[in-house]
């Protein structure tokens, strides 16, 4: 099953996540099909907290990709920010 989920990056105590489309059997930070955005939970000042390619996210959801709970909330927040 194809899923949209977060892959962790960044350094210790300073997380950074990529929104990735991947097979659900792959490791969290392993192989992915496509990166469709990023999420920086510790963004400060002028840093961008969330960036999502809405067109690609919509495409993958239409193809049957299942978002994780956190990604579903982030996609909702991104749509609200763009509206």
From Swiss-Prot:
Any single Gene Ontology cellular-component annotation: small ribosomal subunit
Biological process per Gene Ontology, one example term: translation
GO molecular function, one term: structural constituent of ribosome
Keywords: Ribonucleoprotein, Ribosomal protein
Pfam families tied to this protein: Ribosomal_S16
Domain of life: Bacteria
Keyword Ribosomal protein carried by entry: yes
Alphabetized InterPro entries for the sequence: Ribosomal_bS16, Ribosomal_bS16_dom_sf
HAMAP family cross-referenced by the UniProt entry: Ribosomal_bS16
Family membership noted in the UniProt record: Belongs to the bacterial ribosomal protein bS16 family.
Protein name: Small ribosomal subunit protein bS16
């Amino acid at each position: 099953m194809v899923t949209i989920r977060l892959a962790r990056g960044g350094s210790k105590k300073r997380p950074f996540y990529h929104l990735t489309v991947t097979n659900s059997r792959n490791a969290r930070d392993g192989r992915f099909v496509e990166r469709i955005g990023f999420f920086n939970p510790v963004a400060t000042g002028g840093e961008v907290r969330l960036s999502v390619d809405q067109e690609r996210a919509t495409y993958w959801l239409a193809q049957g990709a299942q978002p994780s709970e956190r990604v579903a909330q982030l996609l909702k927040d991104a749509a609200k920010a763009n509206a």
